[in-house]
């Protein structure tokens, strides 16, 4: 117990009615309890204007829940926060109920990100980040983030980015990232999702659709800790859809390294098709990458390119890739793949990708499809 100061400390209580009145100017209702200022108040706010959204993100603290009403919002500056939530009181930014929310960067200054989070334990879900002059959504050195059911589309650089040292324990679930293109770099930088220039364990990408981006679907350039990627699709990346005469987009589905990092990323049950370079590539990563039950189809170069490292490939399926099923180095371990001796290639139920572009299921997971499915329980992606 702290020694008495000789003064009687008076606890101040704010009535619910007063709290509502105070919060009205910020466009929402905040309800919280505080004990003499010793404990941070939890807060809930519903916003319906761009100014309210900007203020709510700027002023968020642990436990804040920001619910955004349906509509399109045009920030005048990057939505930015350095605030930290906690594992028990995350900061939440989400759509209100099932309402559709677009956060549009078309009024931002040149070179601006649309959203930038520099704190820990954020949950961001059910929002679209579109038309940024640069990156759509960036989380820097974040811990324990949950980024769910997001759309990052038609931005001027990568749609979704995790970066920085200390990027730890983040979940990216059910992301749709498409149409991102960087005109300043002639398409060589804009990926669907980039986890790059950093480190930190426990980061996972699941249920993503990464398509029609100018560079790669996934890019893990210079990220020095293992990332897990599962149940995700990368397709149509690297094609010059912007009539750029000096276009330089790469066009890998899953680029799993580069820049000197040697990392054992884990890549399970994914699919890559119609990319302008490789379906899956080490991209000079010499680490013990593990790839199991992935499918590559109709990519312009190799389905699987692992020519220099120590990757372990098992039960993968490659069909119709113009540069061949796989290009492997002497240190690559390959077993149970359809290019290995004695392994049959099961037929696809469908090669019509139309349903892969369809609406996601009610829980946000990938759409049901027979595209590239085989019914096999031993080889290739299950496409779900």
Regions from the language model: what does each represent?
Residues 78-81, 105-115, 131-138, 154-164, ...:
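Extracellular beta-strand/beta-solenoid scaffold signature
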Residues 41-79:
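Acidic Gly/Asp/Thr-rich repetitive segments characteristic of extracellular carbohydrate-active
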């Amino acid at each position: 117990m702290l020694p008495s100061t000789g003064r009687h400390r008076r606890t101040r209580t704010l009535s619910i009615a007063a709290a509502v009145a105070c919060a009205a100017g910020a466009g929402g209702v905040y309800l919280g309890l505080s004990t003499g200022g010793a404990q941070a108040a939890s807060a809930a706010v519903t916003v319906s204007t761009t100014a309210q959204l900007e203020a709510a993100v700027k002023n968020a603290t642990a436990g804040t829940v920001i619910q955004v009403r349906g509509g399109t919002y045009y920030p005048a500056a990057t939505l930015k926060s350095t605030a930290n939530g906690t594992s028990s009181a995350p900061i939440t930014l989400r759509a209100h109920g099932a309402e559709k929310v677009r956060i549009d960067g078309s009024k931002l200054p040149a070179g601006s990100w649309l959203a930038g989070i520099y704190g820990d334990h954020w949950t961001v879900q059910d929002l679209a980040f579109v038309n940024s002059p640069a990156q759509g959504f960036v989380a820097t050195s974040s811990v324990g983030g949950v980024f769910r059911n997001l759309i990052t589309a038609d931005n001027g650089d990568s749609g979704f980015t995790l970066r920085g040292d200390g990027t730890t324990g983040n979940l990216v679930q059910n992301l749709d990232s498409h149409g991102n293109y960087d005109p300043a770099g002639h398409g060589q930088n804009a990926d669907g999702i980039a986890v790059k220039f950093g480190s930190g364990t426990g980061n996972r990408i699941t249920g993503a659709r990464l398509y029609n981006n100018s560079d790669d679907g996934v890019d893990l350039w210079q990220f020095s800790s293992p990332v897990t990627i599962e149940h995700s699709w990368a397709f149509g990346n690297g094609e010059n859809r912007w009539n750029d005469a000096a276009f330089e987009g790469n066009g890998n589905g899953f680029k799993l390294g580069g820049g000197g990092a040697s990392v054992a990323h884990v890549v399970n049950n994914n699919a890559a098709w119609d990319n302008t370079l490789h379906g899956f590539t080490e991209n000079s990563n010499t680490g013990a990458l593990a790839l199991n039950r992935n499918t590559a189809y109709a990519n312009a170069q190799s389905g699987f390119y692992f020519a220099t490292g120590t990757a372990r490939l098992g039960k993968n399926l490659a069909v119709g890739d113009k540069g061949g099923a796989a290009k492997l180095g002497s240190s690559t371990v390959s077993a149970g793949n359809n290019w290995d001796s004695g392994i049959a290639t099961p037929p696809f139920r469908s090669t019509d990708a139309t349903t892969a572009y369809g609406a996601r299921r009610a829980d946000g997971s990938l759409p049901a499809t027979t595209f590239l499915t085989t019914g096999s329980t031993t080889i290739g992606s299950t496409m779900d």
